Amino acid sequence: MTRFAPGAPAWFDLGSPDVAASADFYTGLFGWTATVVSDPGAGGYTTFSSDGKLVAAVARHQIDTPYHRPYGPGNDQHGMPAIWTVYFATNDADALTKRVETAGGDVIMTPMDVLGLGRMAVFADPSGAAFAVWRKGVMEGAEVTGVPGSVGWVELVTDDIGTARGFYRATLGLAPADTGRKGVTDPVWHIHDTPVAGTRELGTTGAVRPHWAVLFSVHDCDATVRRAVELGGSVENEPVDTPRGRRADLLDPHGAGFSVVELREAYPAAADGAS
């Protein structure tokens, strides 16, 4: 299992108004296996595995703030929004909460222990993009990333990259740097010289608010898009070739945005060098 360095994207879950329906959609789309956590205190939290390795999860969404509606008030069908959340690894969720407040972010959910699995908190950056942090307990995070069937990349979709540069450096220790690649102008976030996340200009998708976007690695972007539509999803941006690979932007049946991409190269998670 990967040991995630502080600041690296470590876990990904979907907040949904209908966990069972969302599980059906994503297992049908990616071939995942869904497993409901047996602990009664988990509230039906359902994990997704690809080839036996944890990749993501879905939970009943119980938080409704403007931060959780990046596609506006219409991105739900059951009174609650649906959204993917990126969790960044941290060694101390409580200390990071203080850094978020100092840097001008908002605390949506104060640090809390999660069934002995770890400790989490939920924040929003100064532009309103929601994200979470994860202090590992017995659960490290995703057991695989960067390969088809798992999260391949994450992006900050924002209209204020200048403020984001300072905020994420001060809170998560992310260092923004230009890619140096032809056709890619938005900065990429690094940890120890390892690229871990990207940025995208707000307005390139149907989103109306800043947010963190999740991109799933797939073998065939076009076939995945067709399958998503068959399962009740919709297309925000049709497949297009990009410097990072062929990608498309989608909405699931409950309005949660996500992307699929045929990565030209895998982006490894920033691993913690501790033994």
UniProtKB/Swiss-Prot annotation:
Residues 8-136, 150-263 form the VOC domain. Pfam families: Glyoxalase (PF00903). Pathway: Antibiotic biosynthesis; daunorubicin biosynthesis; Antibiotic biosynthesis; carminomycin biosynthesis. One of its GO terms (biological process) is daunorubicin biosynthetic process. Signal peptide: none annotated. Keywords: Antibiotic biosynthesis, Repeat. Involved in the biosynthesis of the anthracyclines carminomycin and daunorubicin (daunomycin) which are aromatic polyketide antibiotics that exhibit high cytotoxicity and are widely applied in the chemotherapy of a variety of cancers. Acts jointly with DoxA in the conversion of 13-deoxycarminomycin and 13-deoxydaunorubicin to yield carminomycin and daunorubicin, respectively. PANTHER family: CONSERVED PROTEIN (PTHR33993:SF10), GLYOXALASE-RELATED (PTHR33993). This is Anthracycline biosynthesis protein DauV. It comes from Streptomyces sp. (strain C5).
